[in-house]
Design a protein with these regions (language model features):
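N-terminally biased helix-coil "hinge/interface" segments that flank
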Residues: 2-591
Length: 591
């Protein structure tokens, strides 16, 4: 792989579009941060949040610096990572050519109801055709599924030896449909057709989201008269042109975590460290040795999907500051992997919702889904292919938040509402760790009273569901939520560090009784007995970044016995990393 250092002259604008915030930084001479700011990410129209962040950072430019000195714009994003972790995708039809049933099963393509159509054709290991491509079958698949999907993916057996059937299928699809088409052979030259098909499917599923992002970026840059090349961070930390990202959005899986690794090294000057990036939706952990992150030899693993995308070896878990906190069937607090709008932010944005929250919080007999609220996202219309139940829910929602109990009657209705949210049509709000931090006084900026109502509702719900019939205080609920985030963050860090040495597994994977007890006691900060305790120790610095890092990681580091570094620009570290990278191009030739 050839690495080309970026021209350090002038100003570089770094952006990071995350699940909750869009961050912006300006670097001067490739060395120092001269301005930074952030704005809420507006998922229904990304241009609003991006524009707000860019205008804020430009307004903070020091005297004597001008926007026309910006010579590079580079963007990292967690949109693809979050979509994979939350299983929130565009609907896709995958055509698999020359696959048998076992290959389809091994690919996992039918997981979560994916549309897969087997087509006759394919090649052998020498590139010879096994049979002619079933062109009529391709066209029939488009006719049957084209109206209810947003993209197509095509994967043929041994297409890395002979891609002609994939190319012909794409031409046929484009002849009758305007939808984007991904060919598997263009994403990886490695063998393993089922995994190549999965990677192509993920690429197709992510195409609408990345197009939305890049189009929004283009509009804002034109409005702000910024004329500079636009680059996107890849999962290995290098940069690619925006035009390339439009064709291969799956390359942006782990874009945000990769930028966080680059930014952490840039801001701290460390060469050997463990970095943990806690955002609104996920926590991402990576190990850096000798100034270079470890690259996953097997491809990026995110949300249980093993792709063929070259990326930094990152452990991603669905836990962040805005993870949805609910009680499970055993009436235990659980956080994630779904993200929700914090109740404190909901009431900050829609003050009228506070009275509804107060009314629910004073009830002994709670409605179903008592902490959940939902509203329509602006500027969105319901597509015609949505189900009848989704249509009824859409009609019941408004641009102002409503209690979910007022529009949803059962679990099926809640699942349909979540599908609307997954499609970007609606927003769901719930109690989150960010709310807990507001109640505990460790975070400010939004509506603390709304957060306290959410905690009180959870306490009542817990009392009603358990035999003890005792009610925890809102502060106790919030302290337990804090403990959830701390302990799960510590587990993610421990798993990532143990995985660096072959043969060493985390206690969660081994389930060894003594090992589990020792490690869990250390993570939880509790004694083993009256005369014994367990401690852990990391031999490298722990660099904690992300907006919530300062609230949780002093305690995480203490429990892991790690020296902690929270750098000066930790809340916008990803945006720093977006412009502190390199342009890279790799070429592989089969002889």
């Amino acid at each position: 792989m050839g690495l080309t250092p970026l021209n350090p002259n002038g100003l570089w604008l770094g952006l990071d579009t995350g699940g909750t915030f869009t961050d912006a930084v300006l670097l001067a001479d490739g060395r120092r941060v001269v301005a930074s700011d952030k704005a809420l990410t507006t998922h229904w129209n990304l241009a609003i949040g991006i524009g707000a962040a860019i205008r804020a950072v430009l307004a903070a430019l020091p005297a004597g610096m001008r926007r026309d000195a910006i010579s590079l714009v580079s963007v990292s994003t967690t949109l693809a990572t979050n979509a994979v972790v939350e299983n929130r995708f565009a609907a896709v039809c995958t055509l698999v050519i020359g696959f048998d049933a076992a290959m389809v099963a091994r690919s996992g393509l039918e997981r979560d109801g994916g549309i897969v159509v087997r087509i006759g054709g394919g090649h052998d290991a020498t590139g010879e055709a096994l049979m002619a491509l079933d062109e009529a079958g391709v066209l029939e698949a488009v006719r049957e599924h084209g109206a209810r999907v947003e993209a197509f993916a095509v994967a043929a057996s041994f297409s890395v030896r002979n891609p002609s059937h994939e190319l012909r299928a794409r031409a046929l699809i484009r002849g009758v449909s305007p939808l984007p088409v991904t060919c598997a052979h263009e994403l990886s030259s490695k063998l393993d057709a089922p995994r190549r098909a999965l990677t192509a499917t993920l690429n197709a599923r992510l195409t609408p989201q990345i197009r939305h992002l890049i189009e929004a970026l283009g509009r804002v840059l034109r409005e702000e008269s910024i004329n500079a090349p636009l680059m996107i961070v890849k999962g290995d930390g290098s940069l690619m042109k925006a035009e390339v990202a439009l064709e291969y959005p799956v390359e942006t899986i782990l874009s945000g975590p990769a930028a966080s690794v680059v930014g952490a090294g840039f801001l701290t000057g460390l060469t050997d460290f463990v970095v943990s990036d806690i955002g609104g939706t996920t926590t991402d952990v990576a190990v850096v040795s000798g100034g270079r992150p470890v690259i996953s030899a097997e491809g990026a693993l995110v949300g249980g999907w093993r792709t063929m995308v070259e990326a930094i070896d990152v452990r991603t878990c669905g836990l962040g500051g805005d993870s949805e906190v609910l009680l499970d069937r055993q009436w235990r607090l659980r956080a994630g992997p779904r993200k929700a709008m914090p109740l404190s932010l909901l009431a900050h944005s829609f003050p009228g919702v506070l009275e509804t929250l107060k009314a629910i919080a004073t009830q002994d007999r709670l409605p179903d889904f008592p902490t959940l609220f939902a509203y329509r996202n602006p500027e969105r219309e319901l597509p015609p292919h949505r189900s009848a139940l989704e249509g009824r829910l859409w009609a019941a929602l408004t641009l102002a938040p409503r209690a979910v109990s007022a529009v949803v009657r059962n679990a099926s209705g809640l699942a349909a509402l979540r599908r609307l949210a997954d499609a970007g049509l609606a927003t769901i709000a719930a109690f989150t760790p960010s709310d807990a931090m507001h109640v505990l006084g460790r975070q400010q900026g939004w509506n603390r009273e709304a957060a306290e109502c959410g905690a009180r509702i959870l306490a009542t719900e817990e009392r009603n569901g358990t035999a003890a019939r005792t009610t925890a205080s809102p502060e106790e609920i919030c302290e337990r939520t804090y403990e959830l985030v701390v302990s799960e963050s510590a587990r993610a860090l421990l798993a990532a560090t143990l995985a660096q040495d072959p043969g060493i597994e985390s206690s969660a994977e081994r389930r060894d009784s003594l090992g589990t007890r020792l490690i869990e006691a250390a993570i939880a900060g509790r004694r083993l007995s009256s005369i014994a305790h367990a401690t852990l120790g990391l031999d490298r610095a722990l660099v904690a970044i992300g907006a919530p890092a300062g609230a949780y990681y002093p305690e995480v580091a203490r429990r892991l016995g790690a020296p902690l570094s929270v750098p000066e620009h930790a809340p916008v570290c990803n945006a720093v990393g977006a412009v502190a990278g390199v342009v890279a191009q790799a070429v592989a030739i089969l002889v």
